[in-house]
Amino acid sequence: MQLATRSLFIVRVVALSLGVAALCVALTRPQAAEQHHHTVVPADAVKWGPAPPSLPPGAQAAALLGSPAKEGPFVLRLKFPAGFTIPPHRHSKDEYVTVIAGAFAIASGEKVDRASLEPLPPGSFVHLPAGMPHYAVTDVETIVQINGVGPFDVTYVDPKDDPRKR
């Protein structure tokens, strides 16, 4: 009788081990499969629309991936007309900006000082750390690409500059 009990115990241990192993495999496979896709947006497929209301009027936006308003990574293109100014503001998360076309001039600080602006031609990149006040100006039509992680906020240094409050 002891041999039968011992054999039954071994069978149960092996079955339980196989069940746990199968569960581990089942739980990891869907996650790995979800990570294996990509997003392609050809230049001629970029769809421009209104910019987020946190930007002054006149800007246009095209969401290439995700949404700045939602949890997770996003890629957003912004198109600014010549003579556009983004007043001093900050974000609670890092911002990564690449100049695609035109000329983007940017500086850090709580007041616009044109002498402090650093002109960035196409191909330039700037990292803006969370909490750092900054502002930007365009003298010609300009397109930039913003990469970040949402939800992404904009807080103007001077609340009177916030277009959402007008």
Give the predicted meaning of each segment:
Residues H37-T39, A115-E118, Y135-R166:
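Double-stranded beta-helix
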Residues P30-F74, P159-R166:
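A short, N-terminal "cap"/entry segment at the start of jelly-roll beta-barrel domains
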Residues P81-F84, H91-K111:
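Glycine- and acidic-residue-biased ligand/ion/polar-headgroup-sensing regions
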Residues I86-P88, I106-A107, L128, P133-D139:
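Short beta-strand His + acidic residue motifs that chelate non-heme Fe in jelly-roll/DSBH
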Residues E110-A130:
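Short acidic-glycine-tyrosine-enriched beta hairpin
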Residues V11-V25:
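Bacterial N-terminal signal peptides
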Residues M1-I10:
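N-terminal secretory signal peptides that target proteins for export/translocation
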